[in-house]
């Protein structure tokens, strides 16, 4: 395999330096999906902690002379191998956006692509693979309060994202093999937000500008975990560093959140009011909203042979907005020493300040 791709190593490399060759292997890593929201924050923290970093992605999302970029398809082992050769740790955080409805893309990236990542890691001699999973792998649209990692995988996943995240996490954890010096772990964040977030805040403000944020689903008391992006990154790095000291941690999943559950609508309202938009005032009973969303989904399905309709008002989104779903971080605290670096108050303030360009003029 190495000979087959040695001549390809320059093809996918876009920019960067040879720093990756000047650092001890223990501090060399590759971030798959490093051009994305979470990936960019991960690269920044890794660099600040003295790591040499490769980024593998379908595009180069930023410029940094301290980073080596490799562009390619993660389903293609020849594209992937040069980015993984010579590193000790791979952070795999590539995934289509969770709000997509492209089943084929989810299966290709999260399932097929992850299998390729696992095989290529083994070929390249990578010692640790840390996956960005999701707490949604145990969520079926009903209340979860202080859920632990012992909860079973969802039997009825709420969407293609969750469905393929379950397959992805299982594949990575099952690949753990201490005898062959290949250790894996999965980090399960929930509701990632922060500066440069391309989804939560921009989508929320777009809805507010269109007058779609006047109503809240349910009584507004349902607690949910939202997690600041820097805390998510911190959890990944802790997992990798503790795996180096304790191989017994391999094959495990860890919930990583801000450890401060907050009412779903309170969180959204803080973002909205921080950017000078009105918070939702009116309540729609949860069951009414869910029933209406269910009827709409049936209508969309019936009409699908004639016309393609994209709707954001789905039973899944109603469940996300109207149920309790927050998770225990005790396992991560005990086994990898996790503590959030940034509190919810500071995280919301920093996020709001970073989106000043979306602020509504008073």
Swiss-Prot record:
Listed EC numbers: 1.1.1.170
Q: Which InterPro entries match?
A: 3Beta_OHSteriod_DH/Estase, Lipid_A_modif_metabolic_enz, NAD(P)-bd_dom_sf
Q: Which positions bind NAD(+)?
A: 165
Q: What residues form the catalytic site here?
A: 161
- Please give the catalytic activity noted in the UniProt record: a 3beta-hydroxysteroid-4alpha-carboxylate + NADP(+) = a 3-oxosteroid + CO2 + NADPH; a 3beta-hydroxysteroid-4alpha-carboxylate + NAD(+) = a 3-oxosteroid + CO2 + NADH; 4alpha-carboxyzymosterol + NADP(+) = zymosterone + CO2 + NADPH; 4alpha-carboxy-4beta-methyl-5alpha-cholest-8-en-3beta-ol + NADP(+) = 4alpha-methyl-5alpha-cholest-8-en-3-one + CO2 + NADPH
Q: How does it sit in the membrane?
A: Single-pass membrane protein
Q: Where on this chain is Prevents secretion from ER (motif)?
A: 359-362
What the record says about family reads:
Belongs to the 3-beta-HSD family.
Oligomer and partners: Homodimer.
Full protein name: Sterol-4-alpha-carboxylate 3-dehydrogenase, decarboxylating
